[in-house]
């Protein structure tokens, strides 16, 4: 199966409505990851098929959970997941990509330019030290334990906003260690076509 067909089939299986133009840009993003990976150490994956599954389809599971938001912060964005795929598919959402690794933020800047993502801003720095970002939703993929993720980013969350943490196996123990003033709105299992591993998204809010 050609990569375009593989991506299209995965998106269809997930029940998402993503334009052909956006799908083409997602594949350009994979090309950029492959091109710059040796220089910036962006991903351990080398196989394009695995990149489509792990970096595109896995990131796109976030889309149903950011309906109606205007601003999003992707913390520990690394090579741009889930922020860049989300930005490609949701040009109406202003997205900030934050990472402390300057090599990775250099790549993110390059990717934003080459993909023409006018809705994306890249910030380099430690999340605790950032103060000029406020978002309706703060997300991360495999960034930190939930309690740390929440405490490090609470100052960046708008009133009425929420956290969307992308996790692997159901994080029962991490949920148990959350502070009292954080409410677990939802934990949903995610199905990623072609991925033989558990995925969950944890939606949290301030009480």
Curated annotation (Swiss-Prot):
It holds the Pfam family GidB. It catalyses: guanosine(527) in 16S rRNA + S-adenosyl-L-methionine = N(7)-methylguanosine(527) in 16S rRNA + S-adenosyl-L-homocysteine. GO terms for cellular component: cytosol. The keyword Metal-binding does not apply. It comes from the Bacteria. InterPro entries: rRNA_ssu_MeTfrase_G (IPR003682), SAM-dependent_MTases_sf (IPR029063). Specifically methylates the N7 position of guanine in position 527 of 16S rRNA. This is Ribosomal RNA small subunit methyltransferase G. It comes from Neisseria meningitidis serogroup B (strain ATCC BAA-335 / MC58). The gene is rsmG.
């Amino acid at each position: 199966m050609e990569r375009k067909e593989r991506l299209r089939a995965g998106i269809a299986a997930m029940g998402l409505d993503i334009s052909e133009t956006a799908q083409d840009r997602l594949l350009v993003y994979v090309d950029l990851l492959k091109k710059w990976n040796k220089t910036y150490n962006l991903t351990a994956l080398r196989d394009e098929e695995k990149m489509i599954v792990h970096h595109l389809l896995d990131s796109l599971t976030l889309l149903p959970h950011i309906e109606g938001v205007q601003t999003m912060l992707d913390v520990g964005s690394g090579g741009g997941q889930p922020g860049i795929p989300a930005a490609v598919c949701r040009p109406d959402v202003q997205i900030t990509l934050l990472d402390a690794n300057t090599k990775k933020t250099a790549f993110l800047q390059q990717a934003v330019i080459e993909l023409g993502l006018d809705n994306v801003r890249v910030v380099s720095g430690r999340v605790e030290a950032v103060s000029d970002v406020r978002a309706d939703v703060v997300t991360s993929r495999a960034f930190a334990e939930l309690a740390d993720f929440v405490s490090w980013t609470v100052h960046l969350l708008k009133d009425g906003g929420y956290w969307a943490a992308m996790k692997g196996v159901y994080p029962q123990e991490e949920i148990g260690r959350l502070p009292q003033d954080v409410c677990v709105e939802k934990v949903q299992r995610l199905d990623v076509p072609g991925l033989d591993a558990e995925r969950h998204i944890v939606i949290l809010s301030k009480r």
